[in-house]
Amino acid sequence: MRLSTHPTLDRFDAVPAASYRPGHGAVRAWLYLLAVLVVAMVAVGGATRLTGSGLSITEWRPVTGVVPPLDAADWAVEFDKYRDTPQYRILNQGIGLDGFKTLYWWEWGHRLLGRIVGLVFFLPFAWFWARGMLGRRLLLGLLGLGLLGGLQGAIGWIMVASGLQPGMTAVAPLKLALHLTTASLILAGLVWLAAGTRPRALAPAPEPVRVVAGLLPALVLVQIWLGGLVAGSKAGLLYNTWPDMDGVLVPPARVLFDKVPFIENFIDNLALVQFNHRLFAYLVVVVAIAHAIQAARTASGSAAAGRAMGLAALATAQMGLGIATLLLHVPLWAGLAHQVFAMAVLIMATVHARLARGVPAATAPTGAEVPIGLEALAGRGA
């Protein structure tokens, strides 16, 4: 039996949620499946970046690109296209066909997984909508995520195209950070909607807890953006000491701000890019720990306090993993683990923020339910 200083939370948990609709269990499972696929997409994308495979496919063919090279002639054509890229001419001239195939399969797998995510989204979405299983807010949220997913595919190609420009051997860091952050936004949106389909009501957390809980996903997203800049520019290889940066806690201004115009330092100055990622990590962890203490004091024994404590632990562990990755000079396994674990922190922060808002209890109906999907079409024809 759970002891709580907020018995209303237990009472709310015993009654249905107002927003819950029949079939929401299937919808919730589908949303979490999509979230898992997006995390897998981020993981494969990270491996593609860390192995230098992202520029191995030089064309964007959303439909026909699903078919990989099937014979020696097909492979020769694809290899010839890659040998015409700056990355090959500057970095990989010694690579043979077998080495190229390794690069190619990583990028092809990443793109294939993107297509699978699209199918797993749109086919069940159409089915759920047709059966009237999506409430209005959920429907609008899913439509927004669908549009964002389509935009993400275009951003991915724009990112790759930036690495095919003369003199480039990798994609532009700014575009990589945008690609990673957009994927993270999609993940957060899926988890937010899934948490909102909870079948049982939940009382909101105290207002101070709700406010900080709502702030934390935004802070995590900013940190993911900064991490994307570090990954894209390889700034993690510049200073591999901690807590100092090659003997100083804060590099001098002449090092952090040596580019003109000033704004370019935040994207292209590797020292400042790494420093910002370090500094913001400290901020996220401090806010998460302070929030856990706040929740323990104002909502002792509640689920919100437990979630806040779990989030603080995850954020601290992620910072520790980031430090280890830095000290080890960013080996593939550590860099990939750090990127994937960031998604775990974001998921926890998003679920916590959504549930802290509460899920209202169902009340007696005050009027006819608004039909949705095919129910609405049938009603018009009646």
Curated annotation (Swiss-Prot):
Which residues are involved in binding heme? Answer: 277, 338
Q: In which pathway does it act?
A: Porphyrin-containing compound metabolism; heme A biosynthesis; heme A from heme O: step 1/1
Q: Does the keyword Transmembrane apply?
A: yes
Q: What residues form the membrane-spanning segments?
A: 25-45, 112-132, 138-158, 176-196, 211-231, 270-290, 303-323, 327-347
Similarity comment: family membership: Belongs to the COX15/CtaA family. Type 2 subfamily.
Q: What does this protein do?
A: Catalyzes the conversion of heme O to heme A by two successive hydroxylations of the methyl group at C8. The first hydroxylation forms heme I, the second hydroxylation results in an unstable dihydroxymethyl group, which spontaneously dehydrates, resulting in the formyl group of heme A.
Sorted alphabetically, which HAMAP family does this protein's record hold? HemeA_synth_type2
Record protein name field: Heme A synthase
